[in-house]
UniProtKB/Swiss-Prot annotation:
Recorded GO CC terms: membrane; plasma membrane
Membrane-spanning residues: 18-38, 56-76, 95-115, 143-163, 191-211, 252-272, 277-297
Domain of life: Eukaryota
Main location: membrane
Membrane topology, Cytoplasmic segments: 39-55, 116-142, 212-251, 298-333
PANTHER family: TASTE RECEPTOR TYPE 2, TASTE RECEPTOR TYPE 2 MEMBER 38
Tissue: Expressed in subsets of taste receptor cells of the tongue and exclusively in gustducin-positive cells. Expressed in testis.
One Gene Ontology term from the biological process aspect of the record: detection of chemical stimulus involved in sensory perception of bitter taste
Protein name: Taste receptor type 2 member 38
Misc. remarks from the entry: Most taste cells may be activated by a limited number of bitter compounds; individual taste cells can discriminate among bitter stimuli.
Amino acid sequence: MLTLTRIRTVSYEVRSTFLFISVLEFAVGFLTNAFVFLVNFWDVVKRQALSNSDCVLLCLSISRLFLHGLLFLSAIQLTHFQKLSEPLNHSYQAIIMLWMIANQANLWLAACLSLLYCSKLIRFSHTFLICLASWVSRKISQMLLGIILCSCICTVLCVWCFFSRPHFTVTTVLFMNNNTRLNWQIKDLNLFYSFLFCYLWSVPPFLLFLVSSGMLTVSLGRHMRTMKVYTRNSRDPSLEAHIKALKSLVSFFCFFVISSCAAFISVPLLILWRDKIGVMVCVGIMAACPSGHAAILISGNAKLRRAVMTILLWAQSSLKVRADHKADSRTLC
């Protein structure tokens, strides 16, 4: 027998807790990604040449700032403006569409970063692969422009796929024990189709990311076997670079899979079952993932680590000066 899920209301305590967690996640995510952006952008202001990896990190931080902003707007929408009788109002649809596009650009940039790591760290023996690695290193700016172009194309196609369908309501009456009325809205299905369509466009960069990460893993294995045979020195710059790059890529893979699963689960939770608490949990998971990867990127990048140490030393010296000033003022009194 077919059973329907009743629409559950969300208490004020749950909404307040979710909003508080969302504010914390937004603050942490905004600060970490804004830090990555400002450190690299400051070099641009000083007219210093950015490395290829710094250019990718600059673009990646911008896309994640958009992601965090959209997820925070989604949290505000869920807690204050969204009604369970009509969960997909126009503003929430726009937030979801923009999030899908920003997430798509984020994946393309991660694939570009993975290719860059491969071109720098892997020692190729085949002539074609050597030429390809050299081409990737030289054409990174064009690749970033291509990512922006692909994101714009995906934006147009997703918007066209969503808004080209008719938006009307089909009502089906099911006679059950309580004579419940089930409303199926075609616009809900349109959003789900657009969601699937955008995820299909994510397959090429995801495969590119997996292939390049796999090649880097194989290269690390070969390098470790070579070290065991020819040297006993445990400290090797190339090995450390391989490990840092793989740590960044593996963490992105884990965070991206978790975030994508949460996003995919949130759609039927919202459209079919009207489970706002489940959607809140999914949005919280989606907001935590970019912050975690940004923290790993900061810990694995020498320039960003130096900037963090500079800020910490400045804060420590400022606190010490204030403490000494207060002690001197008390002595004078």
